[in-house]
Structures are given as C-alpha cells and as structure tokens.
Amino acid sequence: MASLIYRQLLTNSYTVDLSDEIQEIGSTKTQNVTINLGPFAQTGYAPVNWGPGETNDSTTVEPVLDGPYQPTSFNPPVDYWMLLAPTAAGVVVEGTNNTDRWLATILVEPNVTSETRSYTLFGTQEQITIANASQTQWKFIDVVKTTQNGSYSQYGPLQSTPKLYAVMKHNGKIYTYNGETPNVTTKYYSTTNYDSVNMTAFCDFYIIPREEESTCTEYINNGLPPIQNTRNIVPLALSARNIISHRAQANEDIVVSKTSLWKEMQYNRDITIRFKFASSIVKSGGLGYKWSEISFKPANYQYTYTRDGEDVTAHTTCSVNGMNDFNFNGGSLPTDFIISRYEVIKENSYVYVDYWDDSQAFRNMVYVRSLAANLNSVICTGGDYSFALPVGQWPVMTGGAVSLHSAGVTLSTQFTDFVSFNSLRFRFRLTVEEPSFSITRTRVGGLYGLPAAYPNNGKEYYEVAGRLSLISLVPSNDDYQTPITNSVTVRQDLERQLGELREEFNALSQEIAMSQLIYLALLPLDMFSMFSGIKSTIDAAKSMATSVMKKFKKSGLANSVSTLTDSLSDAASSISRGASIRSVGSSASAWTDVSTQITDVSSSVSSISTQTSTISRRLRLKEMATQTEGMNFDDISAAVLKTKIDRSTQISPNTLPDIVTEASEKFIPNRAYRVINNDEVFEAGTDGRYFAYRVETFDEIPFDVQKFADLVTDSPVISAIIDFKTLKNLNDNYGISRQQAFNLLRSDPRVLREFINQDNPIIRNRIEQLIMQCRL
C-alpha cells in the first residue's frame, strides 16, 4: 500500500557523496544552538599578524553635560545653558551688554530674616536688602538695572534644594529659572545685542545645549548625577574646550596600506538598521478550533536612508535562533481551543540581522579584518492576534516584549530572490521587558518574552542606529570587483522556496478527490512512482532518492524506529507477564516506551487519558511492524502527498527531501488506533481520548487499560480511519450490519470506497477531516 514509501525510506541503505554532505551542511537550519564565531570567522584570508583594530567615535557627538569648568569670564555661545553650581552664598553670576542691561544673580542661604548686605556687582559695592524665609531651601535672586548708574530691582526668585541655577542667551533674550524646586519654570529678560553679552561666573559651571533643556531642568529640580558630586571630578579651565581632538570621522574611507595590486581600506560608517519579524501561523484541519503551529520565519526588508547627504539603499534579513516552544490545550473535545505549538523568544534566544547596502564599503567585502560596531538597543513589543473561532468569543494573544542588545558582528551571505551578496550579520542578545504576554479567555497569563503571533505590533519596521568600522583588502583598481566567496548562513534561499511550497501544499487540500485518494492509498508506491510528477525525475532519480532518504534519516519517525530497535533488544530477556500494572508497563516498553513514564498506575496521579495518549504515540510503529490488509493513516498521508506533489508547481528536487520528511511527521497529527478482541474493541487516540465498546451494539464498556496494554503487545494494531464516534453516528442514522461494522473497524478500503461512491455524508466528512489534517 501507499505507506510502503515510508517503510522503504526507513529500511533502505543509502550512500552519501561528499559534495552532497557539504551542500547539506550549508543549507541546514539549526535551532537552539548559538556558536560565537568571533570577528575573524569566514574571512577566507590567509593568517597574518593583523592588529585588533578600533571602534571609532564621531566628532558630531555632543555631550549632554559638558564640564565642570572653573570660574571665568567669557562670552558664552548662543543657545547653550550655563548650569551654575555654587557652593556658598554670594554673587553667582553677572552679565551685561554695557548698554541697557546689567543682570546679576545672588544666592542666599536658608533661614535669613530681612537684612541689608553688601555685594560687589560689576566692580562696585552695592547695598542689597535680602531675605529667605525657607528653613531648607536656598534662594537665587536676580538683581537688574537698565542704566549704568541706576538702582537695582529684584526679580525671580528661585527657591532651590539642589542649589543649582542656569542662564542662557536665546532669541534676543536672556533666560533664567524661577519658581520652586522641583517645579521650576523659565523666564526671560529682553536684551539688545544679546549675543554680545559677556558672563562672569563666580563658581564652577557646566554647559548644556538647548536641545537638552529638559535635562537641564531635571538637574535644576533634582540635582546633578551622583558621579558629578564626587571629589574625583576636577573642574577644568574653559580653554580646554578649544583643544582639537583628532578623531576618526563617522563616515570616511582611509587607505591603510597599498601595493601595486591590493590595498587595505578602512571604512567608517554611520549605519541605520531597519528590520522586521515574520511569522507563520498554521491552522489545523477540523472544525476550526485548533492551530498547529505559530512560528518565526526569516523576513527580508529593503529601504533607503540618507547618510552624509548620500542616499543609501539597504537590505536586511532578520532571523531568530534559540526559540522557546509553548503550547495551550483547552481540552479534548473537537470544539476546544488548542495551540499545539507557538514559539516565544526570550533571554536565551538570539536575533540575527544580516545587513547590506550599496555603498563602497560593501562592494568588495570578502577579505575583512578589524570588524567592530557600536549599536543602540531597541525594544520590540508584541501586538494583539485574535484566534477566529467559528463560534464564541475569540481568544486573543496579546502583549510581550523583549529588548535587543548588540552582541557581536560577523560576515555572512544574504540570499534574495535574484542575487546573493556578502553582508554583515549583527547578532543581538535579548532581555525580557514589560508587558508580559497572555492569551485572553484562557488561563495563560503573566508569561514573559515575545511570541511569534504578532511580533511587529503594526510597525513597518524596528530601527537600530550605530557606527561601524572595518578594514577590507580590496583591489587597487577601484573598477575591479572581487569575486564573492559565499559563506554559510542560517537561512538560505531554500527556506524561502519551502515557505512558498508549504502555502501551495496547504491550498491544494481542497482539490483532492476522495475516490482518487482511496485508489492511490491502495497502490504500492515506491520511490520512483511517488516522485514521478517532478520534472527531470529520470535524470535525477538516484541523487534525488539519496537526498530524500538522507534527510528522512534525521526525522522524528526514523529516530523513533531506532529507539524501538534498541528497546526491543533490551526488553527481549526481561519481559515478564504478570497481573500487576508495573509488569504490564515493562512488557509494553519494547514498543511503547512508557515504562519510564508509567511505573505504578495504582499510585500515579496520571489519568487513563494520559496513559493511553502516551501509548498511542508509539502505536504507529507497532502498526508498521505488523502490516495488515486494511488501510492505515500512513496510506492516506502518502496518497495525499503524492497527489499534492503531482499538482504542485513549486516542487523541485531541492525542496522534496524537506517536504517528504515534514509530511511524515506532521500529516494527520490526530490519529486513533484500535485493537479488536472478539466482540470488544479498544480504541485510543493521540489526543488522550479512549473508548471501549461492543461491535454488536456499539454500546460503550469500561476501558481496561491493563487489558488494552496486553492486547497491543500481542495483537495487530489497526488505524481507526473511521473512528468510534463516526461509526456510532453512521449506525444511528443509516444502520449498518455486523459485517459492515467489522469491515469499517478493519479499515477495509473496498467498503470505504463503496460508502464514498454512495456519497455517504458521514464517511465523506470523516475522510475530508483527515485530508484537511494533511497540512505543513
């Protein structure tokens, strides 16, 4: 029958050519393993004594808090705050345009009753009446006069706990602060020739650009950062600002060395990385209440941005590694909401972003050293994804967030639809952030990480800015293009082809005729007949079969058979039949692998449902080992696979091994198996449902798990193509004879075809459900 193809794949010996092995290593996607290759990986260049390089800074970066500087007299630049930090009472600062504005600021200590004090203002002794009623706060008072020989008037004031004050020249005015900390505001004095006003500071001061006014206000309200209040901070002379600091520019090309044919170029670049996540959401067949998989998949993004006046076209590919698998099971009924597997990235995961742009730095990126980058962090927040149920309120997966932090950069190769090119792979480590994610209308909540359901949260892209430096060995002739030597990446072009093929395969489920399906399921499909629909099959038959079997060897089904073989040899001398459940578990272990999970049912908290579902997962192997004349789930699975291969336009020899392997593991996930003992039938499914009933009446009887374990050890195991509920429904509505019932229980293909040809809606509906489960 059709399932012969799986047995052939399991038992055939195969050869491996070295070229095939190398190609497979280059295209295999691994998960849950991250290898830090280091900055010199995959350069393809001879080992030489090169230096460690440098991470370059940019002269365009302006400090937020510049200082402290020693007391001095100077003309401060326009649009910069002078943040003054006096340590004692007295005159803090004074400034004048020598025409119509003389402004000075006086600091008064706490708890001072009204009194007259003498202050030196602009070189002249002045008597000023001051007061400060506050018990804790210091008081800054502005004293102003508009003529050289006029009297001073008081303005402000500013009641301050941190004892900080600030003044700025901006837009024809001199700005200061007033009010009371921590709720200060700014005020101004209109001044002619304001840009020529000289300021004399009598205390240490800092310089803050106007763009950071909010930071300045924060300091006025709450004080300087703790590091500024230690004795290790020594004020400098203001002339230190004029010292020229020679730094590498953010965007420049430097010739490091040059010979007649080759030269070393250092490329320093500002870089803007934009990327987005992509996800695959696969819904299971059936009534529409179950999802089989929600997973991340690689995402390409192309964009343009401006760098030093130059328009740069960039291309990124985002992929993830080290995913965490979660699941949700709402129950065993067909209308219970279930997500078999959904991926979440957390602190043990990594995000890879492959970046390439059309600038000169990437044109000859083959032999590279001294590769370094400084990147900002970015927070990625999940959105809301609604699970559209046929009836009832929809559950919603909502929330979740992670922050990405730069963890290294190496060379890589990107593959697009048309071209492959060498690029840089930026690796990001993750930390979880608020909010947590949950699934509404379920008990899933308070979990941290970013789920794959809606990772972009409606954003077109996430953005990371930073700087990049590398030294590249390039031809001295700028018109010559270095041949690209491809290096290995996690994602290659094959992944894109497989994604398109999966979508096409799932869409073809609607077009399969059931009579054709039963016919195909009865054919002994071998390797050649299964793949005969592919172009150039005859020419590539040997190599293609080898590739399929090589890939299949690593499948879950093949690994299960390996485990079965080992456990059979181990159990051969230790099987002892007895009345205890413990000995039943041991005798069953040769094929069920449940002895380590069910050791003492009488004291176990596990239910019968848990035990039967554990046993049922290995009944497929038992059925394969004792092939009967009835049709089984693998026959249907192989027939559907054959039909879809024949109709597919995307299938190719490269994608076939992955598709066959994936189909063997994922087609018809909800299977049920039965054993027959005279008039009694025991039926158990992988979803934990179990039935025991009589064939004559279809009346249920108590399910004896010990008897079930005994029977499956010695008796043939049969696929429950037509399960108990379908049989009972068929009998209640149409009435079936005892012989018809036995034939359906044995999955007799001839009887199944008769019911389908008669257009029996109950049988057709059951087969349609099985076909819809054949999804990738």
Swiss-Prot record:
Name of the protein this chain belongs to: Outer capsid protein VP4
Span of the annotated motif KID motif: 644-646
Lineage per the UniProt record: Viruses, Riboviria, Orthornavirae, Duplornaviricota, Resentoviricetes
Keyword Coiled coil on entry: yes
More info: In group A rotaviruses, VP4 defines the P serotype.
Motif (DGE motif): 308-310
Region named Spike foot: 510-776
Sequence motif: YGL motif, positions: 448-450
